[in-house]
Amino acid sequence: QDFTIINNKINSLFSFFKKRYRFFYFDRPETDFFTRDDYFANNENDFPLKEKDKLSYIDNIHFFNKNYLYHKLKIKKNINIDKDTLVVHVRTGDIFNNDWHSLYSQNPLSYYLKISEKYEKVLIISGKNLNNPVLKLLQRYEKFSFQSSSFIDDFNVLLNAKNLASSGVSGFPIVAALMSQKLENFYHSDLYLKEHLNPEMLDGSQVTIHSYKIVDGIQPGKFKKTDENLTKLIDDDITKIIRI
């Protein structure tokens, strides 16, 4: 066997020992299971990967997703997307509720304008709640089209894109990029969290990775609903988007 599925019936008998958080922590110090405050609590966060396992996960995650998980994926569809089309995932929804989710920083308008310069068509994939202020501004540009469909349909567009871009802190486009059999170019900014799925996990020998620094971008932890941050988010100055 190339890998083992650990969620078998025997393990389920001891489910109270399972880790409850949905992310692997790739960038946090290792902790000791036996220092838990309450071994049986469901609200305890998961523990980080052990240091000895972390590099192995990161080095192999692209290969594993592309060559194994993709073939296990039951919802996949084959869609033909033009080579001159850039597909961009723009995150909306819960992170913009109330005072915004401080950790989930998103890219400004200028980022989308910069990465789309060489493309004739840009397809924006977003959630149905169009509460990201950038979306309304992008509608002014003729080359941009928009899709907010079902989870399965939207994911399959990302999965079939030859050119794909993320919008900041979000695992959705990273999963698609890791599994993709067609991806040639991936675009991202320096706004992401290393503790879970992120652009650094993509294998540069498989995909051309285009990385950008956002000058004066809203860093994770500071993404809060303020007039200053809103001004930064809708900024269209592409000179602040620097290839790195």
Can you name each region flagged by the protein language model?
Residues 174-244:
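Nucleotide-sugar donor-binding patch of glycosyltransferase catalytic domains
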Residues 102, 162-166, 210-213:
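Short, charged/polar micro-motifs that form catalytic or ligand-binding hotspots
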Residues 113-204:
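Donor-binding and catalytic core of enzymes assembling or modifying cell-surface/extracellular glycoconjugates
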Residues 1-2, 126:
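A short beta-strand-loop structural module common to alpha/beta enzyme folds
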Residues 2-118, 216-244:
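Secretory-pathway luminal glycosyltransferase catalytic domains
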